[in-house]
Amino acid sequence: MSINIEQAIIHEISQDSQGQLRCRLRPQPLLNSQAVEMMLEELHQTYTSKSGKGFGYFGIHGDDGEANPAFSNALQEYRAGDLGFVEFTGQASKLLQEELAKYDFSQGGFLLMSCYTSMASDFLFVALLSAKSSMTVLDDMELSQNNHLDLSNIQLAARIDLTEWQADKDSRKYISFIRGRAGRKVADFFLDFMGCVEGVNTKAQNKTLMNAVEDFVASSELTKEERQQCRNKVFEYCSERFDEGADIEIKDLADELADQGMESFYDFARGGSYELDEEFPADKSTLRQLKKFSGTGGGVTISFDGGHLGQRVIYDPISDTLLIKGVPANLKDQLDRRLKGE
């Protein structure tokens, strides 16, 4: 396993017959069974691989609007040993119930909370899971409908890096969370119940890094192939950090490039007007532009490796055209068959 589970528990928030939300609290933690280990390992892997996560910190009431400190206060008591895990998670469930009650769309769910260790850091994982209906075949070959937790499609989840939170009170990225789809802030209530305030604009930092890399290779005496190698190396490094759940470190990245004969990136990035943090989370979708060009519009979707620009793919900005040399075989076959049909 990639995680070492300390404790885990599930509470339920559901509507009663009058439509009021109620908490059903579990009186003791889940047993460390194989089922629990498999569930948390799957959730850990699924969550870590989610791209486009937001990052924040526990807000201070007044300085950060109406940030509710109740969750962080209870967590602090739990970490100090003044509050048990069951009591802490029970208080958290009540806080979530109160927050959910403010919205008409909520029907509740199963609140999973787990403390575990991974990569020498302590984490608190918090997720509101829903049940999903499925069909199974019984021993007598009859169909039966049952419900199971939908682990592969988590939309309301956050993970608190407890080690970073307690070691660096000025950090603004020790809480990560899944953003709502298509930019909608459907998860606002989930952040509000924890008193979480967004602190680091991950996409902006990754976009700035990409711009710094492009400016760096443009100002260097590298050949075209070496420039693309530099872009690929940056993407490779950042992808590895993303997969490990670790931050991009500008100094570390610069050392990686220096090992490839591309010196002085650190001074270039820090000396310009890029305003890059020393460390920030990776966003794979943004940095993928270092390796690929892609775009969609007007019913046309185009994607190609960056190394093909100027060779197999020629761009003419004056005529606003792309010339593709060597049409992919499967596309060529479709086009040829369409022309024959006409």
From Swiss-Prot:
Classification via InterPro entries: Nucleoid_associated_NdpA
Keyword tags: Cytoplasm
GO terms of molecular function: double-stranded DNA binding; single-stranded RNA binding
Any one Gene Ontology cellular component term annotated for this protein: cytoplasm
HAMAP family: NdpA
PANTHER family: NUCLEOID-ASSOCIATED PROTEIN YEJK, PTHR38772
Name under which the protein is recorded: Nucleoid-associated protein Shewana3_2426
Organism: Shewanella sp. (strain ANA-3)
